[in-house]
């Protein structure tokens, strides 16, 4: 029996982190939902037109223009905004990177904007590269600038939804999903030179780089097409148990974020790969069990 006591301490508002995962999700949803609310139409008025094969794009053309504009702003600020004491266009980790020549340039323009607007005390103080590059400047992976490229990825998800609304036959849906997978994948691969750290715009989740958004969208489109075949066309699988988690992702995220330090979710294991893997599987089982109970009780909490 494990007895757990939770101690609640006052939050120091002078050091409160303002950005975060849920905050970024809400901003991305706000931007994309606002565009969809203003420009969306449910009429398939171009079904018999010569451009019917690409009408999923035509229907979203104003939203495409706005989304690409957001992406253009992101790129312009990332690579053209002058950052005091740093090379223009720098997107490295700072610290020890390149012989300590850019010590406080972590994240380049993205980090500079966050520190300028929010202040050092209100963004993440232990960025991922700190362990390797001994960075000195705080950097927030869910900061202001990266929200623009993240919103573009969110819009690409909306494009997938438009495919299902526009094309009613299996073939039309699959063709469009694979088309978008190939387009986003090809552009993303070209930007990062099909590599992990190279290319014009390397893959970088902390910066939410354009290549990262496009490659992530590519895999998302391919996976959605595969699941559509397995679940909807061939009807070989109903989506369980993942459908349970998919109905309540917000509550599962919050529970994990709150209780991941405590038993029975967390407990000490030796830092051996197979033991850590089993512990991770145990975590998944716990939260899937909670999702299953909520599903059976028809309790669904969403944004």
Residue ranges and their predicted role:
Residues 1-303:
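Alpha-helical transmembrane segments and their immediate juxtamembrane cytosolic regions
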